[in-house]
Amino acid sequence: MNPVEDFTKLNLFGTFTNFVSAPVPFDCYHDPTKSETILVADLPGVLPNDMKVNVDKDKLIIQGKRECEKHDYLFSNRWCGSFIHHISFAKEVKASDVNVGLGEGILKITISNTPTNNVIGVKMSNNNKVEF
């Protein structure tokens, strides 16, 4: 069985684009050597205290905000404000198998492939570096 098939219900951009003016770059891939699925998003300017990642059965819910700077802009291409993103998986996700890191504007979520029936919140790690 191909582990990537577990993500057939994955909808990466639908919810993000409802809240921000431009799509947030978001990648998802499977690392077969570690049996992990990895999600990576570019979130420059988003701080760990402004992020929350929750697991709800077969869904990963990512929400956060980036403060809007008050300037007399001639134009602005950077997004600000709140966002929420729901990622659905083909199987249930166990919160203890989810590792979240945010550093240098990159959000990295690593998920081990272990099914569960629990609904548990996942807290952000406080490290400033994301290791790949």
Swiss-Prot record:
Q: Name one GO molecular function term.
A: unfolded protein binding
What name appears for this protein in its UniProt entry?
A: Small heat shock protein hspL
Domain sHSP per the UniProt entry, residue ranges: 15-131
Which protein family is named in the record?
Belongs to the small heat shock protein (HSP20) family.
Q: Which domain of life is it from?
A: Eukaryota
Q: Which UniProt keywords apply?
A: Stress response
InterPro entries linked: A-crystallin/Hsp20_dom, HSP20-like_chaperone
